[in-house]
Regions:
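Bacterial N-terminal signal peptides
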Residues: 7-17
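Catalytic glycan-binding domains that act on GlcNAc-containing polysaccharides
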Residues: 44-278, 287-293, 299-314, 318-341, ...
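Short acidic, glycine/serine/threonine-rich helix-capping segments at coil-helix boundaries
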Residues: 339-344, 352-395
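Intrinsically disordered, low-complexity Ser/Thr-rich linker and spacer segments
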Residues: 396-402
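Intrinsically disordered, serine/threonine/proline
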Residues: 25, 32, 63-64
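Boundary at the C-terminal end of the N-terminal hydrophobic targeting segment
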Residues: 19-23
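N-terminal secretory signal peptides
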Residues: 28-50, 54
Length: 402
């Protein structure tokens, strides 16, 4: 879900709870007393304030989950093995078949592709089977008390108060991920207020147990974000021998006709007239030795749901597979996986020492790190894809004498 941490089923490696962290300073009781006043001042009714806060205690494992930073980065090919596994594809086709009338009606009303809705449903909650069972109020209250994202978490709790006061949901329905996302489509409370839908007209936006409400809510989000009905999301492409990676920019959008002039070809079939008229970016999620993808405006719409390239590729590919499409053609460079956080910090330090500014070493391979790596690669006559993998790490460390 937009603005939420990718959590339910996909991803954060949780640290051991043998040494549970506790925020320093303010006690939970003191935070709760102060927030009770802020919640009331926001217009929440006394009854709802009591239902949310009376007897509420923190859940310490949520703090551990929030603070944990996985050491190892999952390669995109490993992610896709789960996101678009044979089981998930089969379950997606079954879920679509069971709910075809609802899915198609929702897709038609909001003008989105039905298989995309089903794919998001599959990644967010395994088609409604695993929506999360954490108490959302407890989760958000714990995150607010912990303090790292207090303003955000308190804002989401105020949104919960509005949900309850408006009768959109009941207190016992408010379950989801430890990060505050709810229901079959994993909406955070503020997004729920903005985008959730009452498909069956019963007066509630039941994204927890009502498939129509859940699907319509996701469809409304995609529609409002600009989904282009009939437009593609991604297209796997082959790059020509001698492709000029040094001139490529990750966010460079140009007509597909221009990409074709640069020698790119579809991995399967031929260019369609529709493709050639659209603008697209070239994504290389595993670097220049892995599959390439042209990504279109609908790809950016998917990222409004979850701002992760792997997630967006996973949704688009799962949707295509549910619709009967084939697996990706190009092989993944499994001998050149992403490096871990410690190695990334070492890489950043080495790049800085060599005069390629990657910013303050933090172990996160962001845009500055990739740009610095590309500059290093160009200076050494290497394939300048900026992919922070094992081979690039070895080259930089050797150059730095590490």
């Amino acid at each position: 879900m937009i603005r939420k941490i990718l959590a339910a089923g996909f991803g954060l490696a949780l640290m051991s709870t043998s040494a549970l962290a506790q925020p320093e300073g303010e006690s939970f009781a003191d935070w709760k007393a102060g927030f009770r006043d802020r919640l009331s001042a926001a217009g929440t009714s006394d009854e709802t304030v009591a239902s949310m806060l009376d007897g509420l205690e923190p859940e310490m494992r949520i703090i551990e989950s929030d603070r944990s930073q996985p050491e190892f980065v999952r390669p995109i090919w490993a992610y896709l093995e789960i996101a678009a596994s044979d089981l998930r594809i089969r379950n997606g086709r079954d879920a679509y078949a069971r709910n075809r009338e609802t899915v198609d009606a929702v897709a038609a009303q909001f003008e989105v592709r039905p298989e995309i809705l089903v794919a998001i449903w599959g990644l967010e909650s395994s088609y409604g089977a695993i929506p999360g069972n954490n108490d959302i109020v407890q989760a958000l209250a714990t995150l607010a008390w912990e303090g790292r994202r207090r303003a955000w978490a308190e804002g989401e709790l105020i949104a919960v108060g509005e949900m309850l006061d408006e009768g959109y949901a009941t207190r016992d329905q408010l379950t989801g991920s430890w990060a505050g996302a709810m229901g079959q489509m994993q909406f955070i409370p503020s997004t729920y207020l903005e985008r959730a839908q009452d498909w069956d007209g019963d007066g509630r936006r039941n994204i927890w147990t009502h498939e129509g409400d859940a699907l319509a809510s996701a469809a409304n989000l995609l529609s409002r974000a600009g989904w282009d009905l009939g437009g593609p999301a991604i297209l796997e492409v082959d790059l020509p021998e001698g492709f000029d990676f040094a001139a490529w920019q990750p966010h460079d959008s140009r007509p597909v006709s221009q990409w074709a002039q640069l020698g790119l070809t579809p991995a399967r079939g031929e260019w369609s007239a529709d493709h050639l008229m659209r603008a697209a970016r070239l994504e290389l999620p595993a670097g220049g030795f892995g599959p390439g993808f042209l990504t279109f405006d609908n790809f950016r719409v998917i990222k409004r749901y979850n701002n992760s390239t792997s997630y967006a590729i996973g949704v688009a590919h799962l949707a295509d597979r549910i619709a009967g499409g084939e697996a990706f053609e190009g092989p993944w460079p499994e001998d050149n996986p992403p490096i871990n956080r410690t190695q990334t910090r070492e890489l950043q330090t080495a790049l800085n020492s060599l005069g390629f500014n990657s910013g303050t070493p933090d172990g996160i391979a962001g845009p500055n790190t990739r740009a610095a790596l590309r500059a290093f690669q160009r200076s050494r006559g290497l394939l300048a894809d900026g992919y922070v993998g094992r081979q690039a790490y070895a080259a930089v460390m050797e150059a730095a004498g590490g």
